[in-house]
Amino acid sequence: MDQDVMDFFDFSKEFKREVAPQGYISSDPKMMATDSIDSKVPKREVIGTEYVTEIVAKEKGLLNRTLRDECPQSKRKHTLDDLDTDDEEEETEIRRDDEYYKKYRFNLNRDKNLPIYAKREEILAAINANPVVILKGETGCGKTTQVPQYILDEGYKSGKYCNIVVTQPRRIAAISIANRVCQEREWQQDTVCSYQVGLHRPTSLEDTRLLYCTTGVLLNNLIRNKTLTHYTHIVLDEVHERDQDMDFLLIVVRRLLATNSRHVKIILMSATIDARELSDYFTTTNSIPPVISASHGRKHSIEKFYRDQMGSIKWKEEEDDQLVPQINDHGYRAAVKIIMVIDNMEREGAIHSRMSYDEALRYGAVLIFLPGIYEIDTMAENITLMLENDRNVKVFIVRCFSLMTPENQRDVFHPPPPGFRKIILTTNIAESSITVPDVSYVIDFCLTKVLVTDTATNFSSLRLTWASKANCRQRAGRVGRLRSGRVYRMVNKSFYQREMSEFGIPEMLRLPLQNSVLRAKELEMGSPVEILALALSPPNLSDIQNTILLLKEVGALFLTVDGVYNAMDGDVTYWGTIMSRLPLDPRLSRLIILGYVFNLLEEAIIMAAGLSMRGLYVHEGSSSRSTRAQFDSFWMHYIFADGSGSDLVAIWRVYLTYLNMVEIGHEQESAIRWANRFHVSLRSLKEMHLLVQELRVRCTNLGLIPFSVNPSQIMDDREKSFILKVIIAGAFYPNYFTRSKEMWNEHDRHIYQTISGHDPCRTVYFTNFGPSCMGELYTRRIKDFFHDARIPPENMDVTFQPGSEKVFVTFKQDDCVADSSKLVSVPGRVQSEVYKAVRMRLSCMQRIIRIMRPKQFMNYVQERGIGDVIEGRWIPPTKPLNVELLALPSVFSKTITGLITGIINCGKFYFQPLSLAECIRNMSEIFNAPQQLRKYVVDACDISKGMMVLAKRDSNFQRATVIRPENQSNRQPMFYVRFIDYGDCALLPMQQLRFMSEELIQQYGDLPPRVFECRLALVQPSSMVHGNYSWPTAANDLLQFVAKCGRIDIEVYSLFNNVAAVLIHMRNGTINDKLVAQKLCRRSDEDYMSRKDHDFRLRSQESGRYLSSAERQQINEEYLRSCQLPQDFDLPPPPQDLCGTNVRLKGPYSPLECSMQSIIRVGSSKRVNIDSASVNAVLLDTDPQDHHDHLIVAHATVESPNGQTLTARGTTLMPNVQGYGALMVMLFCPTMQLKCNEEGTSYVSILAGLGCDPVTGEPYYAEHDVLINLDVNILEDDLVLINQIRYYIDSVFFNFKEENYPAVSVNERESIYTQLRSLIKRLLSKDRSYIGKNMSNSDFVWETNPELPMPNEPFGKRAIFPMHSLTELKEDDMGRLMNLRENCSMLHKWRNFEGTLPHMTCKLCNQLLESVPQLRLHLLTILHRDREKQIDFCNQ
């Protein structure tokens, strides 16, 4: 802010030299370490729960001393609200509440039919006599609603003050139960009885005596108050669920109950509870909690059958397979057999029973419990196969899982069609959340999927495991509602009894502990280890240690405690305080924190809320909807992402659309239609809306309030999008992945070879369609494959390669004036249709085509005269091509003079050579002759798409093609046309069109355009200036200005697919260089085919001087002919009844499909997938000419059960900015080492993470160390900028240890905000030169270097982002420079060699060169040209 701060970042100032880490690492062609011995993570020792015994013994000793050392001399009386220790032997003043009880009506008549009523007196007596009571009552016995009322009624009778709180694990339960109690007692809501979920609570709780709340609400209140005495009774319901909130609440309750709140009564309730475990947990020397059981008999009996009791079903799998949690084919078939047995049983029973078979069907629904959606779909397929084999059994299949829409979930409750049996395929959602009355049969595979997190890696995995007996009992309880029922358990009885656990694994033993550790810190009653050791099921000590490392990584904890490093603890940062107060995962809280820093708090809150929601997008299962509907469901993600390549941006835009609809006040039916159209869940959006509101309030309470900026400082959409991606990268470090490119030498060539020279950004291909299939006759049927992807057949060309089994589908570019509202934006150069096509393959859409047999085919084409048959070989019909008439530039022409006649943007404009001016004039005179302009268009229906007409351009009529009709305005027909000989487009009324006479069509119908398409060479749009690979308006305006100047000279760099890459000469250089200098675009490599053509043109122009004019013409015609791609014949296919052979095509594929790699050490050797619901599920190389990896950031990473594969969720594709990944790592890592090459002349790699032990050099958190090999130059200036940004982020939240809140003022925040925007822009908009990858042998090694100067730390050890140190670079050795220049000179000499090249290495770029063509193309890359500049090499 002032000069002193700026001086701090000046590396030219003198530094105090101290010991600091430093070292070298290796690099490879994938920007990361290879899977070498060094890169493999040493196995971290797992430390179990041995630590618990000592801590628990110490705790019990403390509690016993507290009970024993009571002070009998004290005569002080106190009330229940006293926060001091409540000594049981002292007389306690009873607080009365008579006036309150007179204020409200108390009806003491309780429902005596509920089973719990029989235990009423026993329960009340136990509560009066014991501090803790355990109540075990079956679901439906009435414990949740009645027990709190019993307590309140007793208070009313005695006049004693009561304040009861009842916890519920879910929001909806707390709300609905409170409303039900109010209705039962006829109390007005939010008076005697109320609820609190999150921050949603009554304005005042003064009159509330019975509060239903979520577990987290009570937990936060107790941690904040550090006493229970605000309540007289605390009822913890559904204790068996054992989530982390409940387990931590038990710790807090037990601790406070024994210290300062011993007069508060605790009631623990559940349907399936381990009563002995809980009783032991709360047992003290003075008290053992009693256990009371309340159950009710069932009206209808339930029979249970196990696998070994089902004799009629023959099980085929091996005995060992029965022990593995899985469902194999035998299991699915066995379930189908059970359904058939049930049906036969009921048919026979109907003969001897009063209930008819049809009635039995109606009340005989079968509920099948399966572990996941995949198993549900597989089970449905098996049942469908059964129906095909046995027509007598009719079933109505209903799916039920959490991601379905509420409308589809309601199908579960509807009766089946007459004569059908309802089969419900469900996950464990139907265990307790859904009760279906007509279920009489349950088939239980006794399996479930649980989320387990490895705390060392922070990777979560969804593991298939055996359900607990408690789960199975709840599942069995789903039958017998209306009649007797049966339960079929697909395991042996002995296995169920002996091997399956009684209860599930508590969350504290399988999920991340970050929130529990932060709560332990906030509780201030000991270290996290000391607090969590007191849990009902204590976690492993190594899990606590790993969690503390994770919290240090996200900035929630400092590395030190009171300035001293502690592996098991750390002081809480203000970031940690914020994270503990927000009901989110710490990384989502970090997203909000960084959103606040950059004044994009609202956007960050929305994204964080959306990521914490499950089922925002609707998934219906693979066979429940049409193929097109499934595809539309996925494609809506792209619409909302709007070309950002970000699931988070898509969430933000979905929510804004929903919010706008809510504010406008759309009716419910309209909202449902909108949700169905865009395949989003209204229920999830409503929950998300509530969470967004809650987060806003919590952020305000924490002082996180956005400030207003001047209109001139408001971010435009481009900058906001860019800054949001910086925030996302900062929030989810180090969940970074690189979009890996194959870097082997011939990969570029392989891309084009794969698709036979087509444009990879517009082309996909199928395989398995052999040459004998005569594919040209079936092009229309191949186009029909894309119907479900909504790609019209006229928007594609289908071509073939002779002798190949490939089919190429090339999508046409929508030329000009495209209807942008109908387009879906995707990042980079690749057309959206390519994404759609690849998604078709991933969605397993069927691609079967019926063809004729070869002999029949030959007869068919000969009879109809389709093409020619020569020597038994069919030659498809072709259009003659006169290449000499093409306006394309000659291979011998380097510079051409002419006019730019039509401009779409800098990447697409049209050039009319001056040599064709005479031809243009002659044509114009003919077209505008009076006799040619008399053919008026009278009826708009006579105009069709693709028709050639005469259209008015300026004052004359010219040749034009009709692109499409436009919506009629004022009944005036309008048409978009493209002028064939100028390239520009126009929207014209019908009156400005004329039909072409047959004479004109015959003469000019086949004449190629008198212009050719161009694009600027060696440049591409900059992500910093404009997103979605779009050219900025300022760049297009400059091109328009140049075009208006008249004649210009263009230099043809290359010609590919009839598009010329050109450099446009100006007075002071080229427009290409000027746009780069003005930062309106950035330098770019040309792709393989362009460089190949450029090299060919250079050599042709060199040799052309020695050729005659006729020879040059012949060579040029051959060259232009080779540039033309095969044609789409678009022949009518033969009738289906003549086609008797099925061919299954494989694909479509794109040669641009690429994979990802994790950059953290523990994930570097694992395969990486992207979640199938992500907008990046189809991952393509959006800029194939760019040879540098792109960064993808994930919100979360899930590991496969076998540990070999990672799945990235909530992904964002980062901008294609040079060195973006390295810059983000340096910006947001805790610390790093920037390492040099062996000569010390340049920085070559980054090792980032929590750092290492300064004595031993052992990394603190080796699993999450990040290694990046640099491919661009990082300079000292970059480090200065990065340190400044880190300083400013820290300064927003810095507070001294004795302060509760940061001291930064609003004015200072505005100044910081302005500085950060400027610094980020300067850092990311630099045009960095490229460097070759460096190799080293010390991957992931943190080393110490006593010579390394340590920067001064403005915030000392209380910095979340400490300053990075910098190694001073050395000057290049002159001998080494001369060696490199000599190597370059030799490479240039070999460039013109026509023989076999001995293997060479470009020492500048560390690139092995194996052939002369490869050498030539390498010399044209930006990498090599930049490196030549760096060593001042000039080729003579």
Curated annotation (Swiss-Prot):
Catalytic activity: ATP + H2O = ADP + phosphate + H(+)
Segments forming domain Helicase C-terminal: 337-524
Assigned EC number: 3.6.4.13
GO terms assigned for molecular function: ATP binding; ATP hydrolysis activity; RNA binding; RNA helicase activity
Compartments (UniProt record): Cytoplasm
PROSITE patterns: HELICASE_ATP_BIND_1 (PS51192), HELICASE_CTER (PS51194), TUDOR (PS50304)
Single biological process term from Gene Ontology: intracellular mRNA localization
Function (record text): Probable ATP-binding RNA helicase which plays a central role during spermatogenesis and oogenesis by repressing transposable elements and preventing their mobilization, which is essential for the germline integrity. Acts via the piRNA metabolic process, which mediates the repression of transposable elements during meiosis by forming complexes composed of piRNAs and Piwi and govern the methylation and subsequent repression of transposons. Involved in the repression of LTR retrotransposon copia.
Protein name: Probable ATP-dependent RNA helicase spindle-E
Source organism (scientific name): Drosophila yakuba (Fruit fly)
Annotated gene: spn-E
